[in-house]
């Protein structure tokens, strides 16, 4: 249940962002919409760096602690609040003008000043998931995420749609929603963690958390920066209209983490146990089995989205954003490499240094490859740059090191044959559905997309059920075990 709540909260957050994007794409013109998205991009890009891995450190410091639980939490929140406050000061004292100049968008000067309070409000709330999961309050986490995201959607949509407040109003509503998130988060965290007599936050405790969090959090920070550099490059090198189109297509598909996070968390404890007992053959079999189960669920969904991408972008964001289908389709090419988190093997082998090295290489290469591609191809180049780096560096890097850790050959690490069969089925179903769609006289993008998706699923589901029924049923049974509470430890990381 912990894992599903963790994944579910991420899915709810992603759906909330999707709802806001869908409304603002229709209410604002592309220039105003780009201003809103660029304002949020500043925190989305810098936020992981500011956090220093401190929220994840609570998974280590809270379990087993009896005498200083509340103090450990307060030390973590003080550090997060201080780091968020420093960035808020940076924005308020001239950083807004500097960023507006780099993005060639003078309107950012006003919106970033309005947004300046947001980092100090929101950064402490990044600890909510860790605290509530460790303390066994998973229902609280889901309710908190659902309520605060609904509040944010209501505030932003109300400001933009009903009040016609423009991007400054939408950003102001986002900042106000930060107060709601902080209030709810602090209330729940303090309720979940009991107070002790005679125990207070100390500088020594803060220092201990920093020493633990920074090395582990550094890899996570760099990987998030690496995967977000595409939007920064498009903001700097392309027009605001192009950034608006790109940002909608470059969205994180909500279902990806909702599928892969539970699957990885199901596998990770057993994978660690097998690795520690030096049973690497069984660990490899477990790994391949998990990859097959996720592939049967994830790849068909991605295939359907690939085929109906233009209709999906039109339905979500209006006809003005039909070209957002280009970046979406390019990023969907990453799905076969994201069937599982390779970091699970690195964690099982206690080789987090490999995650850090991968992150550094990904960040540097993404900048080096994407910059000229964006200059030459426009915003499409950013998507292709990320895909080239992922398939040309990240995937081979993971295959090489994971095969060594499991003492096998790279071509035995993944279920390539099964993945290939699924991709062939998707390609055949997609081609037939696209051919049939050409003969349908449907005037609505929604009807056209729905009809195409339905045809693809009708063509896909029977052969998938016939060939991979065991994997599908096994995946469902594993999730049912999680729902029954038979799990240990925190949710798996990336």
Where are these predicted regions, by residue range?
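Signature of the first transmembrane helix
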Residues: 1-56, 83-88, 92-93, 153, ...
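N-terminal membrane topogenesis motif
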Residues: 1-17, 70, 74, 108, ...
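Helix-loop junctions and terminal segments of transmembrane helices
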Residues: 17, 22, 50-66, 133-134, ...
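Interfacial/gating helices of multi-pass transporter permease domains
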Residues: 23-45, 109-110, 167-171, 205-216, ...
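Membrane-interface junctions at transmembrane-helix termini in multi-pass inner-membrane proteins
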Residues: 61, 121-144, 332-361, 372
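Hydrophobic alpha-helical transmembrane segments
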Residues: 109, 113, 142-192, 212, ...
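Interhelical loop/hinge segments that connect adjacent transmembrane helices in multipass membrane
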Residues: 139, 167-171, 185-227, 266, ...
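Membrane-proximal transmembrane or re-entrant/amphipathic helices at the cytosolic face
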Residues: 409, 432-494
């Amino acid at each position: 249940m912990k894992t599903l709540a963790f994944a579910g909260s991420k899915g709810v957050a992603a759906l909330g962002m999707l709802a806001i994007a869908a409304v603002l794409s229709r209410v604002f013109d592309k220039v105003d919409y780009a201003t809103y998205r660029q304002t949020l991009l500043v925190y989305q890009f810098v936020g992981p760096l500011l956090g220093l891995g401190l929220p994840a450190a609570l998974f280590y410091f809270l379990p087993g602690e009896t005498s200083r639980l509340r103090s450990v939490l307060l030390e973590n929140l003080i550090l997060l609040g201080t780091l968020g406050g420093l960035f808020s000061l940076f924005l308020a004292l001239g950083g807004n003008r500097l960023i507006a100049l780099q993005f060639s968008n003078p309107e950012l000067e006003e919106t970033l000043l309005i947004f300046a309070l947001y980092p100090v409000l929101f950064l402490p709330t990044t600890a909510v998931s860790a605290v509530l999961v460790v303390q066994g309050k998973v229902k609280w986490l889901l309710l908190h995420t659902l309520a605060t995201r609904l509040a944010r959607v209501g505030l932003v949509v109300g400001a933009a749609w009903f009040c016609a407040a423009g991007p400054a109003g939408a950003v102001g509503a986002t900042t106000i929603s930060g107060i709601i998130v902080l209030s709810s988060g602090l209330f729940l965290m303090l309720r979940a963690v009991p107070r002790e007599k005679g125990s207070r936050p100390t500088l020594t405790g803060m220092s201990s958390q920093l020493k633990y969090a920074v090395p582990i959090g550094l890899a996570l920070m760099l990987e998030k920066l690496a995967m977000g550099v595409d939007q920064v490059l498009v903001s700097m090198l392309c027009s605001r209209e192009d950034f608006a189109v790109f940002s909608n297509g470059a969205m994180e598909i909500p279902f990806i983490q909702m599928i892969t996070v539970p699957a990885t968390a199901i596998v990770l404890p057993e994978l660690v146990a097998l690795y520690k007992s030096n049973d690497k053959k069984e660990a490899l079999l477990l790994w391949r089995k998990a990859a097959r189960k996720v592939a049967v669920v994830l790849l068909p969904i991605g295939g359907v989205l690939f085929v109906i991408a233009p209709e999906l972008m039109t339905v979500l964001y209006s006809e003005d954003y039909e070209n957002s289908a280009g970046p979406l389709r390019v990023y969907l090419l990453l799905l076969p490499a994201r069937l599982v988190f390779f970091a699970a093997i690195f964690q099982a082998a206690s080789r987090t240094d490999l995650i850090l090295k991968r992150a550094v290489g990904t960040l540097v290469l993404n900048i080096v490859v994407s910059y000229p591609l964006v200059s030459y191809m426009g915003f499409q180049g950013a998507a292709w740059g990320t895909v080239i780096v992922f398939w040309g560096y990240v995937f081979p890097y993971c295959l090489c090191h994971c095969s060594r850790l499991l003492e096998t050959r790279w071509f035995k690490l993944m279920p390539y044959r099964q993945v290939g069969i699924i991709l062939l089925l998707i390609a055949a179903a997609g081609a037939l559905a696209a051919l049939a769609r050409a003969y349908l006289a449907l005037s609505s993008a929604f009807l056209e997309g729905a009809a195409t998706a339905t045809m693809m699923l009708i063509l896909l589901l029977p052969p998938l059920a016939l060939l991979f029924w065991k994997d599908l049923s096994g995946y469902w049974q594993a999730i049912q075990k999680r729902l029954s509470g038979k799990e240990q430890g925190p949710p798996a990381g990336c």
